[in-house]
Amino acid sequence: MAVSPEAAAIIQRKKAQYCRFADSNQWDRFDSIMLPSATFLFHNPDGSVITKGDIEYSWSSTKDWVAFFENEFKTMQTIHILGPAEMGQIAPDEIKAIWAVTYHAGTKEHQGGVHGTGGGHYHETWKKVGDDWFMESLRMERLYWKLLSV
């Protein structure tokens, strides 16, 4: 089913805010984009869950996802760049969206440190609550990640 221009505009705006809020460390603002019970899963190209040490990139609430990335990005600067979304309305209150993303992350110091560039696709479900739309689930399928010491 086709997505209404109004619903598409709301979701596109909120996804742009997702990137801006993450890149500018405005973690307290994600509750305006995501349901409290939103789920998050990040995959490698081979389908395995991304890990860092013993931590799996899988969260069952917005609060847990925010807590992880708020801490993770304290010493990092990021920029997320999205392509246009593919959207389909699954039910009157549910829209599926897929976004291409390229992201850069690096330590905040001007010299030395590390820099990484990655890309992939966000697969998301958005739910209508009243007259607004909120992210219910996010699955990131990473296609590329390159980390360099600088």
Curated annotation (Swiss-Prot):
Gene3D superfamilies: 3.10.450.50. The keyword Lyase applies. SUPFAM superfamilies: NTF2-like. InterPro entries: NTF2-like_dom_sf, SnoaL-like. Keywords: Lyase. Pfam families: SnoaL_4 (PF13577). GO terms for molecular function: lyase activity. Disulfide bonds: none annotated. Pathway: Secondary metabolite biosynthesis. The keyword Cytoplasm does not apply. Its EC number is 4.2.1.-. It is an enzyme of class 4 (lyase). Probable cyclase; part of the gene cluster that mediates the biosynthesis of the tetraketides fugralins such as linear fugralin A and cyclic fugralin B, volatile compounds that play a role in the asexual reproductive cycle but are not involved in pathogenicity. This is Probable cyclase FGR4.
